[in-house]
Amino acid sequence: MTATLTPTLELAFDLIRRPSVTPVDEGCQELMMRRLAACGFEVERMRIEEVENFWAKRGGDGPVLCFAGHTDVVPTGPLDAWQYQPFDVRVDEEGMLCGRGAADMKGSLASMIVAVERFVADYPNHRGAISFLITSDEEGPAQHGTKAVVERLRERSERLDWCIVGEPSSTTLLGDVVKNGRRGSLGCTLTVYGKQGHVAYPHLAKNPIHLAAPALAELAAEHWDHGNDYFPPTSFQVSNLNSGTGATNVIPGELKAVFNFRFSTESTVEGLQQRVTAILDKHGLDYHLEWALSGLPFLTQPGELLDAVAASIKNVTGRDTTPSTSGGTSDGRFIATLGTQVVELGPVNATIHQINERVLASDLDLLTEVYYQTMVKLLA
């Protein structure tokens, strides 16, 4: 079967068979860097802590189109649950490319490389520049990957006008959805302090569960904002709630609650924090808050990049795309802080992070063509 593979699928095979479980890269970036260097890119390795990253650029003055992505994949889960071994990549009898990373996001990486190789061959003197920002730390803590590389680029005033992130944005058919923004993510660990005691003598103790419950209920019922044309209303979710010693006759001394905001551009970090504090204070709690901001919301309005991507999808697939800001966070949140227009465009996401991850193999060739046509519209 290998002899009949398209160039995009050949590269996808080579990437997927490498077990690059986050933050390990397993030579994926070395393969990509060799291909890019061969078509005139200046390649810069950026190993930060245990994370492999690289920045590559080709071209001169003018607008810069960046392709961004990650070579790391999530853990496989139980191997005996897979129809085929997760790194024993193949195209099955239904034409599906099977393997961990097929959708998220080694298929996109292969499409990017092959599209750029073709574009550079067809337009060796293209205007502006093409760049790549690739990391092995997207599926993990995401502290020493794109986030850290972006800070280095910022320090040296590197220009990034447009960025295509290869995250699997499509829902049912290739290109039916692109992400033109993402909600912000603000997490918090709340500790409510009480006083431990015997359940038979509640007047000698302070039960933090009883004390915290009304406040948590009010937080859960609060309407934080109404959203806008691009974002749904901000959501509040408690993800962990822990208290107690394990004994049935002991009132616990403290309660810990972990919660998360996915917030729109209608809310700010400071505003959400102030409102949480006001509600907790209203209930007279003795508490401590530890906040963790994962990323601010960002939005790419209709313009050069979104228009070029949408037109290319229409030309290649015949369908109109729908811009969306739904879903979780991505590395686009870091790149957007440079003032860059960011669009996420990749294959169907129906099986990402699942057992038996797969995508339609032919979709990767279509994706290659979409990336190619987008470059033609922006840089030819």
Curated annotation (Swiss-Prot):
PROSITE patterns: ARGE_DAPE_CPG2_2. Its cofactor is Zn(2+); Co(2+). Belongs to the peptidase M20A family. DapE subfamily. It comes from the Bacteria. Its EC number is 3.5.1.18. Catalyzes the hydrolysis of N-succinyl-L,L-diaminopimelic acid (SDAP), forming succinate and LL-2,6-diaminopimelate (DAP), an intermediate involved in the bacterial biosynthesis of lysine and meso-diaminopimelic acid, an essential component of bacterial cell walls. Gene3D superfamilies: 1.10.150.900, 3.30.70.360, Zn peptidases (3.40.630.10). It is an enzyme of class 3 (hydrolase). The lineage of its organism: Bacteria, Pseudomonadati, Pseudomonadota, Gammaproteobacteria, Pseudomonadales. Binds 2 Zn(2+) or Co(2+) ions per subunit. It catalyses: N-succinyl-(2S,6S)-2,6-diaminopimelate + H2O = (2S,6S)-2,6-diaminopimelate + succinate. This is Succinyl-diaminopimelate desuccinylase. One of its GO terms (biological process) is diaminopimelate biosynthetic process. Zn(2+) 2 binds at residues 104, 139, 353. The active site is at residues 72, 138. Zn(2+) 1 binds at residues 70, 104, 167. Keywords: Amino-acid biosynthesis, Cobalt, Diaminopimelate biosynthesis, Hydrolase, Lysine biosynthesis, Metal-binding, Zinc. InterPro entries: ArgE/DapE_CS, Bact_exopeptidase_dim_dom, DapE_proteobac, Peptidase_M20, Peptidase_M20_dimer, Peptidase_M20A. GO terms for molecular function: acetylornithine deacetylase activity; cobalt ion binding; succinyl-diaminopimelate desuccinylase activity; zinc ion binding.
